[in-house]
Swiss-Prot record:
GO terms for molecular function: methyltransferase activity. The thiolates of the vicinal cysteine pair (Cys96-Cys97) directly coordinate the arsenic atom of the organoarsenical substrate. The gene is arsI. PROSITE patterns: VOC. Its EC number is 1.13.11.-. Changing H62A: Loss of catalytic activity and iron binding. Roxarsone (III) binds at C96, C97. Residues 2-119 form the VOC domain. Fe(2+) binds at H5, H62, E115. Nonheme iron-dependent dioxygenase that can break carbon-arsenic bonds, playing a role in the detoxification of environmental organoarsenical compounds. Catalyzes the oxygen-dependent demethylation of highly toxic methylarsonous acid (MAs(III)) to arsenite, which can then be exported out of the cell. Can also cleave the C-As bond in several trivalent aromatic arsenicals, including roxarsone (III), nitarsone (III) and (4-aminophenyl)arsonous acid. This is Trivalent organoarsenical cleaving enzyme. Keywords: Detoxification, Dioxygenase, Iron, Metal-binding, Oxidoreductase. Organoarsenicals are used as herbicides, pesticides, antimicrobial growth promoters, and chemical warfare agents. Arsenic is the most widespread environmental toxin and is classified as a Group 1 human carcinogen. It comes from the Bacteria.
């Protein structure tokens, strides 16, 4: 297998190209008026953006990029922040999908969630939290707390874990 392929419907191709260029640290290899293609070698990914008039909700649970260390999670978070893409929420030593992980989450221009995560070890027990870590489910409390429009003086220390 050479490449995994994801075709993502988007409502604003220009904003999406800008976002994903920053996310992947690469420019698309092909751009048309209604289409853009990123071809990444590591990880092997053929990722296309397909312009649509509307996208109704998050049609996927979430996307993720697994890295090899907590330091790499932090490096990606810092790299994206330097490019204007801020973490929506961070999870350190969180139990998710029967694994102990460090991660952070961001959203693309259409609201699709991406996580950068490092799996420290497997665990026998799954999280006691609602299953939003592995499957995206609407969480109004988390969204209000962790959204970029949330008040900067609001205490968010416990709402995003």
């Amino acid at each position: 297998m050479k490449y995994a392929h994801v075709g993502l419907n988007v409502t604003n191709l220009e904003k999406s190209i800008e976002f994903y260029s920053k996310l992947f640290g690469a420019e698309p290899v092909k751009v048309k008026p209604d289409y853009a293609k990123f071809l990444l070698e590591s990880p092997g990914l053929n990722f296309t953006l397909n312009l649509r008039d509307e996208v109704n909700g998050n049609q996927v649970g979430h996307f993720g990029i697994q890295v090899e260390s907590t330091e790499e999670v932090v490096a990606h978070k810092n790299r994206l922040a330097e490019n204007g893409i801020l973490s929506q929420y961070d999870e350190i030593n969180t139990t998710c999908c029967y694994a102990l992980q460090d991660k952070f989450w961001i959203h693309d221009p259409d609201g699709n969630e991406w996580e950068f995560f490092y799996t420290k070890t497997t665990v026998e027990e799954n999280s006691t939290h609602p299953p939003t870590c592995c499957v995206n489910e609407p969480n109004v409390e988390k969204a209000e707390c962790c959204s970029p429009t949330a008040s900067s003086n609001k205490d968010t220390s416990n709402c995003c874990s």
